Amino acid sequence: MNKVLYIKANAKPEGKSRTFKISDVFIDEYKQNNPDDEIITLDLYKEDIDFLRSKDLDTVFGPKNEESKNHPTLKYAYQFAEADKYVIAAPMWNLSIPAILKAYVDYISVVGIAFKYTQEGAVGLLENKKAVYIAARGGSYAETPYELDGIYLRSILGFFGIKDITTISAEKLDVQGENVDKILEEAIDKAKETAKNF
């Protein structure tokens, strides 16, 4: 049985978020194909996530032991490390990710949990896992230098050792004259197909 962490990062509620329209279908399709897997939903806007403070840094960068698992600053890092698969649903905002998702990444980017330092440099500790990033975007940014949301998430996940990463994006949703329903339908179809083999 695999443990799937479904990370949601959008201030818009269910029903209004175009990103969640796609990601929720992905999760439903995944459940149908993997009924025994555990899916944990983490809605970041419903969590008490703040930016890391100076008092948190010693905990994040210091040595870890059994008691570390009970430290409130490290709870997201341990939860992330315990998962086998990740579904990250977040819209592109201002060419990047929502600030709350970046704050969350800071909480999970923990030495000794997500990666470690060696004489050769940093080494990811989360190998043999996979992730899918699902995003709604107002313009057309896929595979361009402006796709900073996807570039960043693929980079940080790769830094953790996660190399199997798929991006599903609905592009041009705010471009005048585009058929938004058709764009979303195509992204949902891709989400369904991706979920079958995820």
Curated annotation (Swiss-Prot):
This is FMN-dependent NADH:quinone oxidoreductase. Its EC number is 1.6.5.-, 1.7.1.17. Homodimer. One of its GO terms (molecular function) is FMN binding. The keyword NAD applies. SUPFAM superfamilies: Flavoproteins. It catalyses: 2 a quinone + NADH + H(+) = 2 a 1,4-benzosemiquinone + NAD(+); N,N-dimethyl-1,4-phenylenediamine + anthranilate + 2 NAD(+) = 2-(4-dimethylaminophenyl)diazenylbenzoate + 2 NADH + 2 H(+). The gene is azoR. It comes from Clostridium beijerinckii (strain ATCC 51743 / NCIMB 8052). FMN binds at residues 92-95. Binds 1 FMN per subunit. Its cofactor is FMN. Keywords: Flavoprotein, FMN, NAD, Oxidoreductase. InterPro entries: Flavodoxin_fold (IPR003680), Flavoprotein-like_sf (IPR029039), FMN-dep_NADH:Q_OxRdtase_AzoR1 (IPR050104), NADH:quinone_OxRdtase_FMN_depd (IPR023048). Quinone reductase that provides resistance to thiol-specific stress caused by electrophilic quinones. Also exhibits azoreductase activity. Catalyzes the reductive cleavage of the azo bond in aromatic azo compounds to the corresponding amines. Belongs to the azoreductase type 1 family.
